[in-house]
Structures are given as structure tokens and as C-alpha cells.
Curated annotation (Swiss-Prot):
Cofactor dependency: Mg(2+); Mn(2+)
Free-text comment on the cofactor: Binds 1 divalent metal cation per subunit; can use either Mg(2+) or Mn(2+).
Protein name (record): Inosine/xanthosine triphosphatase
Coiled coil in keyword set: no
UniProt cross-references to PANTHER family, sorted A to Z: NON-CANONICAL PURINE NTP PHOSPHATASE_PRRC1 DOMAIN-CONTAINING PROTEIN (PTHR34699:SF2), PTHR34699
EC top class, as a word: hydrolase
Length: 171
């Protein structure tokens, strides 16, 4: 059984990690241990590079806390080009897989507040009345009318980031 350290305690992210690992390695093939670690970037990262750095930092910090795990996984959400997206970073001590998620364009009323220094999650919670929306369906669930959720979009990115770990051509 793979010991997987999730560099987050966010249920939406943990669900995506678990589903993706089970899809690739088989049901019941992994045990997820969530840990809260620092990203080293602002609460609301802007731009692809800052967001990717946050995910990389989280993986590195989780690895320092739990060096005996098989995998360390981080999902860092950010804002870039008027849209929200995330970077997924997965490390197994030998190689690293990284993937960027799909992007969701955000309406100006939301972006204006985020650009003024507020994080997307709290802004969306105020806009929708859904407490801790970032730990649930997220802006993605709201603006796609539930057709996608934060977790479902992250799931795809985790699957992509796992590609180097089960395809020999990457080695």
C-alpha cells in the first residue's frame, strides 16, 4: 500500500488525490495522510510561477515532515489571466510530476475584490453564502452550475501529474 502525504487538509483536494491514486494504482492501494504545511507564497497566489512555487514548496515541506512516505502531493490554487487554476506537484523521492489544471474565468465582480487583496475562497463564500466554499465545490462548482467541482478539476490534474509514475517512457 502506498503511503501518500497530502500537503493539504482541504477535503476537496484530498478527495481528488485519493480518487486519482486509486484510478491509477487500484482501489485501496494507498493511504492518504493529510498535513498542514506552509506554501511560502501569499494566501492568494497570482501568476503561474508563484502558484507552482507554492505547490513545490508544500511538497518539499511535507517531505521534510514525513520522509518515509512513498509519495508527497500538493495542490496549489492561484489566479492568472483573470482565471482560477491550480498546480499539482507529486514527488516520490526519485522523480516529480507536475500538471496545471483547467482554468475557470472569473467574473469582474469577484476579480476586483481578489485584486484588492482578498483571497478567492472568502470572496466566494460571501458571494454565495456557502461557508468555506473552498473546502467544498469552490468557484468551479458555482460557475459551472455543478457540472464540475473543485475536486473534479483537481482530479484530472492529479491524474496528469501521476503520468511519470506509471509510464516507463518517463524513466
Amino acid at each position: 500500500m502506498h503511503q501518500v502525504i497530502s500537503a493539504t487538509t482541504n477535503p476537496a483536494k484530498i478527495q481528488a488525490i485519493l480518487q486519482a491514486f486509486e484510478e491509477i494504482f487500484g482501489e485501496g492501494s494507498c493511504h492518504i495522510t493529510p498535513v498542514a504545511v506552509e506554501s511560502g507564497v501569499p494566501e492568494q497566489p497570482f501568476g503561474s510561477e508563484e502558484t507552482r512555487a507554492g505547490a513545490r514548496n508544500r511538497v518539499d515541506n511535507a517531505r521534510r515532515l514525513h520522509p518515509q512516505a512513498d509519495f508527497w502531493v500538493a495542490i496549489e490554487a492561484g489566479i492568472d489571466d483573470d482565471a482560477t487554476f491550480s498546480w499539482v506537484v507529486i514527488d516520490n523521492g526519485v522523480q516529480r510530476g507536475e500538471a496545471r489544471s483547467a482554468t475557470l474565468p472569473l467574473p469582474a465582480v469577484i476579480l476586483d475584490r481578489v485584486r484588492q487583496g482578498e483571497a478567492l475562497g472568502p470572496v466566494m463564500s460571501q458571494y454565495t453564502g456557502i461557508d468555506e466554499i473552498g473546502r467544498k465545490e469552490g468557484a468551479i462548482g458555482v460557475f459551472t452550475a455543478g457540472k464540475l467541482t473543485r475536486s473534479s478539476v483537481y482530479y484530472q490534474a492529479v491524474i496528469l501529474a501521476l503520468s511519470p509514475f506509471h509510464n516507463a517512457v518517463y524513466r
